Amino acid sequence: MRRKRTAWILCVVALTTVLYTIVVSRMDRKTDIIVGGVDGAFVRGDSVSFADPNATETPEPTPDIWPDIDITLPQYQMVNEEHNLAAAFEPEVAKIERTSYMMFSVAAMPHLDAMLDALEDAGFTVHVGGAYRSYSFQNKMFNSKASQIAYPVTDYTDPKYQEAVEEAKKITMMPGTSEHQLGLAVDLFDKQYTRLVYSEMNQDFYAWLDEHCAEYGFIKRYPTKKLLLTGWDEPWHYRYVGVEAAKFIMENDLCYEEFYAHYVPEFKY
């Protein structure tokens, strides 16, 4: 009888020791699997991290070192509806050699010629669809578009004609608001198009220009994705601003308004 009792006591002690060992070992271990992932996977408990509810979204990186330029130089002049050119403004221009009558800034002409030569060397045909336009020429273009929209109304004082003028503003720049008057802008195509639909144009042609234009001091002035900032969607329009500024603008995916505002804080766009 005493032997049975002793054996029973030893069993209890042994069982207690085993249970104690298990509990202690569990206390020292981290949970193996506790969280299910959205893709059906699971992760270890010690690898789980939770978002800080007070954290703020990391802003898009902005350029640190901006070009040291004099924004008052003619090549940086801002031209839009709020920053107009006078009717008397006439830059020094000359004919672009590969065209019949298109004119461009004399000072920037070597850069344009070099870019168009390189474009042709890359295997593309170049068609200059627009370059320098005087104030009076832009005025004729605008009035022609307004009259076309208003037809058959011809009375300038008629409300319907005024509505046509407002519609024309969405299609054609008003005189004094076009960069073409600066003599620093060109509309470039690989051929003459009957309608300007960018998606139907040669995208390899523009891919080359977008990659290399800054090497010659030009920027893509009115890219589609910057429409809300520039007010215009003309991805075939290239503007000369000089190599330093052009490389910075194109490399940082800026439109000219964003670049200009850095140097002229009061400028709003």
Describe the residue ranges of each PLM region.
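Extracytoplasmic cell-surface/polysaccharide-interacting catalytic and binding patches
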Residues: 2-269
